[in-house]
Amino acid sequence: MTVGITTSITRHPLVWGVAWSLVFGAALVVAVMLDWHGLIDWLLIGLLVLPSTIATVLVLAATPRTHFEAMSSVFSHFFVRYLALVFGLTAWGLSVVVGAAISQSIQLAAEQREDEIIGIGFDLMLVVVPLVAALLWAAFVVRCAWFLVRVRGWAEVPTADRVPEHLFASRPALRRIVVGLAHPALFAATGLVVAIAGPSAVGTLEITF
């Protein structure tokens, strides 16, 4: 039975990757609905993205930068950087607006009670920092997914790709699984789930006036 499962994973790595993500995604939904401990939420999020993230890191880490320069057109080169700048500008603008809101909220909530100002500030930061981090993570995921498209394409198991031959050259079955799991759509979907679910897993903010 173990041999059969291993063979199936080798032949259809993307299908198994999607199934893995769906199982832990469903478990995450149940955990959120039943209000389980936050550590369980983070554990499920980590397990959900584990296969595609590890595979993506292995593929992109093995691919030299010269490969991307050879594959990129002038348009794609500037378009990806444009998207990165948009995400960066949005994150900066959000930090400025939220920073002003934090200052005002602390003053209003504390009502000249200096001993509570620091505590309120930390509570607000526990909400703001995860939101900004999630936005930057989303930008990182989109950029890596774009690189994956350029390196290995959209096929489940590409017959011709630009992944360096030295990546698991002596273990073709493992190479097939890694390249299959490093699918741009799978990595983008699971990565964006983290960007959406991550801030909510930190907890909700409650300030008593």
Question: What are the residue ranges of the model-derived segments?
Answer:
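Cytoplasmic membrane-interface regions of multi-pass membrane proteins
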Residues: 1-6, 56-81, 142-175
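Transmembrane alpha-helical insertion/packing segments
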Residues: 1-69, 76-77, 95
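Transmembrane alpha-helical segments of multi-pass membrane proteins
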Residues: 12-19, 73-97, 169-186
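Short alpha-helical packing/oligomerization segments
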Residues: 116-162
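Membrane-interface segments at the starts/ends of alpha-helical transmembrane spans
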Residues: 34-44, 77-78, 110-133, 167-179
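Long amphipathic alpha-helical segments with strong coiled-coil/leucine-zipper propensity
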Residues: 47, 58-113
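Juxtamembrane boundary at the C-terminal end of a transmembrane helix
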Residues: 192-209
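Hydrophobic alpha-helical transmembrane segments and adjacent interfacial helices
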Residues: 22-35, 84-106, 190-197
